[in-house]
A protein has these predicted regions:
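Cleavable N-terminal export/targeting peptides
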Residues: 1-27
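Short glycine/proline- and aromatic-enriched beta-strand/turn motifs that initiate or cap beta-hairpins
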Residues: 20-71, 160-171
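Outer-membrane beta-barrel channels and translocator barrels
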Residues: 25, 58-60, 93-98, 129-133
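Predominantly the C-terminal beta-signal and adjacent terminal strand-loop region
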Residues: 26, 69-75, 128-171
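Residues that define the transmembrane beta-barrel architecture of outer-membrane proteins
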Residues: 26-28, 43-49, 79-85, 98, ...
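Residues on the lipid-exposed face of transmembrane beta-strands in outer-membrane beta-barrel proteins
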Residues: 34-36, 51-55, 87-91, 104-108, ...
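Sequence/structural signature of outer-membrane beta-barrel proteins
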Residues: 35-41, 68-76, 94, 106-113, ...
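Helix-adjacent hinge/juxtasegments
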Residues: 76-107
Length: 171
């Protein structure tokens, strides 16, 4: 009986560690975020979806690729599409269930309403694990557009903010 009680206490003490285990080198993750808006008559609608795949280099460093797709539908006009593909690197702080991160991304933007061009910028976000493999993520990205390396410095101040909220899964 004493041995059973000791094992039960040990198991109860280790359970939170197992549930809140941080990703390790080689762990992969996928995320999915979305947003949308319409006017009151649904004559103009905007839908955005963003997904990513990444792999941890260690428990703090994550690199990967992000894909954004935007669909713009306005009554009387053809539906317009926009996309952005970029590689990213994020550094995560801490080891608990809530981990802030900072990072940067570089890639391209393309579509019907934009000039095909390069984009880059810093990002900051937060991940909160609800169990060992599933998390909620929020992020703010500052993206600026440029056609060449020499133009990047000139256009940095003319960037835009991109917000996302989504779910992620580690495997």
């Amino acid at each position: 009986m004493k041995r059973l009680m000791s094992l039960s206490v040990l198991a109860a003490a280790l359970l939170p560690v197992a549930v809140l285990a941080a990703p390790t080198a080689g762990t992969q993750e996928i995320t999915l975020s979305g947003a949308g808006s319409s006017d009151k008559d649904f004559d103009s609608t905007l839908l955005n979806v963003q997904g990513s795949w990444g792999q941890y280099l260690n428990e703090s460093s994550l690199w990967g690729i992000r894909q954004f797709v935007g669909i713009f539908d306005t009554e009387g006009e053809s539906t317009k599409f926009q996309g952005a593909t970029r590689v990213f690197y994020d550094y995560h702080f801490g080891t608990g269930p809530t981990r802030p991160f900072i990072g940067a991304s570089l890639g391209g933007i393309y579509g019907d309403n934009v000039d095909d061009t390069f984009m880059a910028g810093p990002e900051i976000g937060l991940k909160h694990w609800v169990n060992d493999s599933t998390f909620i993520t929020g992020m703010v990205e500052y993206q600026f557009l440029f056609d060449s390396g020499s133009e990047a410095e000139d256009t940095y101040d003319d960037g835009t903010l991109f917000y996302s909220l989504g779910l992620g899964y580690n495997f």
